[in-house]
C-alpha cells in the first residue's frame, strides 16, 4: 500500500499500541479497554483521521495480534487512511523504531514528518494537531520538530529514599511533555538508533532528538490531552470526551 501524494513533505501519524499498560488495571491492555463505549484507541485514531493535516495514520500493534478491524468490527479500523502494522516491540523505543521502518516500507521519505502519539491520550483533537503542525512548520525549512507540552504549574518536590521531601524543585522553565511529538522521519530514525547504540534510555522521541544535539520546539498542549495511566483516569477521560469537564483547546496548567 503506497502513501498519499500530498505535494511537499507529507505528514504521518504513528501510534505505538503494543504496550500492556498494567498500571491501568483491567483484563485488557489499556488502549483496548472501553472508554465512552468504544476502545480507547478508537478515540485516539479518530482525532488523526478527522485531521486534514495528516496523510496517513499508522498503528503499531503486537506481532500476531488479531487485526483491529476484525477485533473491533464496524468501528472504522479499516479506514482507507489507516494502516496497521504488527511489528511492535518490547518497549516504546522498539515499537516506534519498528514503526518508522514500516513507514519506509510504505514509501515514506527521509524528510516526511512523523507525529508519534501515545495510544493512551484519547483527548487529542484535530485542533491540537493543527496547532503543533502549524507551529513546527512555521519554524522554518530547517525545523527540527517539536512536541505538545504544558508549562508545569504545580510545586515540585524531590523525595529522599524514605519518601520524605528532600527539596523543592524550582519549576521555572519546566514543561510537562505530551504527544504528538513531530520530527522528520530520517532524523528520528537516526536519533533512536544512536540512543540504542549508546544504551541510553529514552522515554519519548524528544529525548532522543535532544541527545543528538537538537532543540525541539515546545508547543502549548491542553489539559485534556493527558495520558490515561491509572484506573481513576478512565472516569476523567470519559468526562472530557463527553464534554462534562473543561475542554478548551487553549487551556493550560
Curated annotation (Swiss-Prot):
PROSITE patterns cross-referenced by the UniProt entry: ISPD
Disordered: annotated span: 1-28
Site, as annotated: Positions MEP for the nucleophilic attack: 171, 227
Keywords: Isoprene biosynthesis, Nucleotidyltransferase, Transferase
Enzyme nomenclature, EC number: 2.7.7.60
Keyword Transferase on entry: yes
HAMAP family the UniProt entry points to: IspD (MF_00108)
Family: Belongs to the IspD/TarI cytidylyltransferase family. IspD subfamily.
NCBIfam families registered for this protein in UniProt: ispD
Protein name: 2-C-methyl-D-erythritol 4-phosphate cytidylyltransferase
Organism whose genome encodes this protein: Ralstonia nicotianae (strain ATCC BAA-1114 / GMI1000) (Ralstonia solanacearum)
Amino acid at each position: 500500500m503506497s502513501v498519499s501524494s500530498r505535494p511537499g513533505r507529507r505528514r504521518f501519524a504513528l501510534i505505538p499500541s503494543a504496550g500492556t499498560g498494567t498500571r491501568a488495571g483491567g483484563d485488557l491492555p489499556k488502549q483496548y479497554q472501553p472508554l465512552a463505549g468504544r476502545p480507547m484507541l478508537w478515540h485516539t485514531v479518530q482525532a488523526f483521521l478527522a485531521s486534514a493535516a495528516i496523510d496517513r495514520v499508522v498503528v503499531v500493534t503486537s506481532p500476531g495480534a488479531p487485526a483491529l478491524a476484525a477485533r473491533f468490527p464496524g468501528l472504522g479500523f479499516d479506514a482507507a487512511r489507516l494502516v496497521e502494522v504488527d511489528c511492535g516491540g518490547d518497549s516504546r523505543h522498539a515499537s516506534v523504531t519498528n514503526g518508522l521502518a514500516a513507514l519506509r516500507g510504505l514509501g515514506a521519505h527521509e524528510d516526511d514528518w512523523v507525529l508519534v502519539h501515545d495510544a493512551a491520550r484519547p483527548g487529542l483533537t484535530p485542533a491540537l494537531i493543527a496547532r503543533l503542525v502549524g507551529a513546527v512548520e512555521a519554524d522554518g525549512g530547517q525545523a527540527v520538530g517539536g512536541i505538545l507540552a504544558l508549562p508545569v504549574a504545580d510545586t515540585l518536590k524531590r523525595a529522599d529514599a524514605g519518601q520524605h521531601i528532600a527539596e523543592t524543585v524550582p519549576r521555572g522553565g519546566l514543561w510537562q511533555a505530551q504527544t504528538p511529538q513531530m520530527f522528520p522521519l530520517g532524523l528520528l530514525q537516526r536519533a533512536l538508533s544512536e540512543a540504542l547504540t549508546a544504551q541510553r534510555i529514552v522515554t519519548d522521541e524528544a529525548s532522543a532528538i535532544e541527545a543528538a544535539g537538537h532543540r525541539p520546539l515546545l508547543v502549548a498542549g491542553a489539559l485534556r490531552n493527558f495520558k490515561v495511566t491509572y484506573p481513576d483516569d478512565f472516569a476523567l477521560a470519559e468526562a472530557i470526551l463527553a464534554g462534562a469537564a473543561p475542554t478548551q483547546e487553549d487551556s493550560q496548567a
